[in-house]
UniProtKB/Swiss-Prot annotation:
It comes from Human cytomegalovirus (strain AD169) (HHV-5). Interacts with UL38 and host HDAC1; these interactions are necessary for the HDAC1 interaction with UL38. Interacts with host MTA2. The lineage of its organism: Viruses, Duplodnaviria, Heunggongvirae, Peploviricota, Herviviricetes. Disulfide bonds: none annotated. It is found in: Virion; Host nucleus; Host cytoplasm. This is Protein UL29/UL28. Contributes to activation of immediate-early gene expression. Residues 1-33 are annotated as: Disordered.
């Protein structure tokens, strides 16, 4: 019975697999319903999508988006019954290629890429609408041959509408007051022609006056030019008979606190430098004594008399030369000045052929000092905790990505946040990746250092800057983290790499204390000296005057023989001045000291509690005698040793690295031929234990 059932089931299965299943006929009296086809929800034109494409500069996607929604209408904020019609280069109301080239070349004094995004219809008039590479929206009036800057972005364009367009105001006034006689078209055309000719002449005169200032590539060059050409008058395109008189902050009476107040009024909080102030033919002018300032990104601002806020005038100096002070009276009209022949400018200044340097905009977010510091020490805030978690992330599963991916994601998410460092005071790291700061160095630049070659993969986390100052990517120290969790600092100005810490905790506790160049700063006063370095040597000013005179340095050490001072740094080490006679109690015997004296090494004292003899070489460098003839260089000068001296004994390793093809002498590098065993995966680690810990351990035993 079971076999018969199995056979039937097998036959049924074979028959069903060979022939397709037959559908049952519909029941009598029941009609079969047609199957509904699934359809997608129709897409609707969205202004946010259009603005996002313009911000990302995805012009190919913008062209497809405009073609897909061609003919869609959006009501503008002003005036009523004013409609924006979506359309691109293939719309029926589009411009010709000749008209588009005319708009791109003949209005700004230089070529500016414009992309057609549609038209605006008001009454019986149509205005073509463009967007440039920075997101600004322009409208073209073909009747008067002029451009109007409607808004700085698309969101402002949809909110403000055509409120900056003069013909729209004139048409509304003509409709409300029909009895007012209009200007004859021929007379109006003649006025427009004269206006264009006047604008072209005034622009050429202003461009000739600003040609040397436009050749300055960065803020430092502009500051030097203003300092060298004080009281020089640069003619403006508008108002007429007005000029910019170059003056420094001291001439204008601008203090550092006032410049910081100006900086806080900006959205980006970028550093600003004064260019001068406006002077007219008559003192009784609205623009008299208006101060002009330039930001670190090249943006030009105006400071009105009696106000603490800055007004943005132009995106860069070349744009300021084109518009002058017209934005102060809400004049956003661009006359057609035609193509500018720069042959005369090239003869006067050949460097003008170089393009104006466009610096990347870096936005910094600085919290208040009370939320950053607690009793003079940086708080371990939530941003620090998030950085620690991303720094020390481990892979719990073998298929999960490496820990550097989490660190990169966190740095990109918190780009622009400023975190205070333990040292130096009021210095911190601004988080961000290389794209955020515009760091475009080749990896070969970093692979020239042996410590970075052995570090494996490197991750960029930010730049070091002073509080409320945006770092300069060309000169600011760069902070890198290796795959092992070690922190490095690359200084472009010195072309050196410093090892800041072997872990996140060591980096947070020490800050930039391993960067030796900070300890060779010039002497300022006792207050700054105590706040920065925390030593007790009172004669630092006299010592700074004789750093390169070895005889006087030895005389100072002999005059202070027997006196004890506290060295800088967190380990409480004491240095005692003295000669080799009093150093006999140390482990270094007379024979070793005699051999070192023949090599021009002189004993200047010893350190406690490590009880190590300190020597000065023939060039003024400071060395410490560890054991036998093992010497370690601690500093380049006696001043740097007093300021930093005890730091090496807490973290005994090599800190400073020069390129492999360089023969420069670096601090904290063993100078003897003794080879110490490797205690770590990296070459820059000298010992796995701290000398201070070993000394305290033997003392306790």
């Amino acid at each position: 019975m079971s076999g018969r059932r199995k056979g039937c089931s097998a036959a049924t299965a074979s028959s069903s697999s060979s022939s397709p299943p037959s559908r049952l006929p519909p029941l009598p009296g029941h009609a079969r319903r047609p199957r509904r086809k699934r359809c997608l929800v129709p897409e609707v034109f969205c202004t946010r999508d259009l603005a996002d494409l313009c911000v990302r500069r995805d012009y190919e996607g913008l062209r497809r988006y405009l073609r897909r929604f061609e003919g869609s209408c959006v009501s503008l904020g002003w005036p009523s019954q004013c409609i924006y019609v979506v359309g691109g280069e293939h719309s029926p109301h589009s411009l010709t290629e000749i008209d588009l080239e005319h708009c791109q070349n003949d209005f700004f004094g230089e070529f500016r890429a414009l992309h057609l995004i549609g038209t605006v219809s008001h009454a019986t008039c149509r205005y073509q609408v463009f967007v440039d590479a920075y997101g600004a929206v322009f409208a073209y009036d073909a009747q008067e041959d002029c451009l109007y800057e409607l808004a700085s972005d698309l969101a402002g364009f949809f909110a403000k509408g055509m409120i900056r367009c003069d013909p729209v105001h004139e048409s509304i006034c003509a409709r409300l007051q029909p009895n007012v006689p209009l200007v004859h078209p021929d007379h109006r055309a003649e006025l427009c022609r004269r206006s264009r000719a006047s604008a072209r002449g005034r622009y050429l005169r202003s461009l000739l006056a600003f040609r040397e200032l436009l050749a300055c590539e960065d803020t430092a060059a502009r500051c030097a030019y203003v300092e060298a050409h004080r009281e020089a008058q640069l003619t403006l395109i508008w108002p007429e008979k007005h000029s910019l008189v170059l003056r420094t902050a001291r001439d204008l009476g601008l203090s550092a606190s006032m410049l910081r107040r100006f900086q806080r009024s900006l959205y980006t909080r970028e550093p600003v430098m004064p260019l001068g102030e406006i002077e007219g033919a008559e003192d009784k002018t609205f623009f008299h004594r208006v101060r002009i300032l330039c930001g670190d990104t090249g943006t030009v601002y105006a400071a009105l008399v009696g106000q603490d806020k800055l007004v943005r005038l132009a995106r860069d100096l070349r744009g300021f030369v084109r518009v002058g002070l017209a934005l102060l009276i809400d004049d956003f009209r661009y006359e057609s000045i035609g193509p500018v022949d720069r042959s005369s400018l090239y003869e006067a200044n050949p460097e003008l052929r170089l393009p104006f340097k466009k610096r990347r905009l870096v936005v910094g977010y600085f919290d208040s000092l009370s939320s950053l510091y607690l009793r003079g020490q940086p708080k371990f805030s939530s941003i620090w905790r998030g950085l620690r978690d991303a720094w020390t992330h481990k892979r719990p599963k073998p298929r999960e990505r490496a820990s550097g991916v989490h660190l990169q994601r966190y740095v990109r998410a918190t780009a622009g946040r400023w975190l205070p460092l333990c040292w130096p005071p009021l210095h911190g790291i601004m988080l961000g990746d290389t794209q955020y700061f515009g760091v475009v160095r080749d990896h070969k630049t970093y692979r020239r250092f042996s410590c970075l070659r052995q570090a494996g993969r490197l991750y960029f986390i930010g730049l070091v800057s002073v509080y409320e100052c945006v770092p300069d990517a060309n000169t600011a120290p760069e902070i890198w983290v290796s795959g092992h969790g070690h922190a490095f600092a690359y200084l472009p100005g010195e072309d050196k790499v410093y090892v800041l810490g072997l872990s996140f905790g060591e980096f947070f506790e020490n800050g930039l204390f391993a960067v030796y160049s900070f300890f060779e700063r010039d002497y300022v006063d006792e207050i700054v000296e105590g706040a920065w370095f925390k030593h007790t040597f009172a004669g630092m000013y006299e010592l700074s005057q004789i750093l390169h005179d070895r005889a006087n340095l030895l005389r100072v050490c002999q005059l202070h023989a027997g006196s004890k001072i506290r060295l800088g740094g967190s380990p409480a080490c004491t240095f005692t001045f003295g000669s080799w006679n009093v150093a006999e109690a140390d482990e270094a015997n007379n024979f070793v000291i005699g051999v070192l004296e023949q090599a021009h090494f002189v004993v200047i004292g010893w350190m406690e509690p490590v009880n190590k003899a300190v020597f000065m070489d023939a060039h003024g460098g400071i060395h410490v005698l560890l054991y036998g003839t093992m010497l370690v260089k601690l500093a380049e000068t006696l001043r740097g040793f007093i300021r930093q001296g005890s730091f090496w004994f807490r973290c005994p390793r090599r800190f400073c690295f020069s390129p492999l093809d360089s023969s420069a002498t670096v601090a904290a590098k063993p100078v003897s031929s003794h080879t110490s065993p490797a205690y770590d995966v990296s070459e820059y680690v000298f010992s796995g234990r701290s000398v201070l810990d070993s000394v305290s351990g033997t003392g306790a035993s």
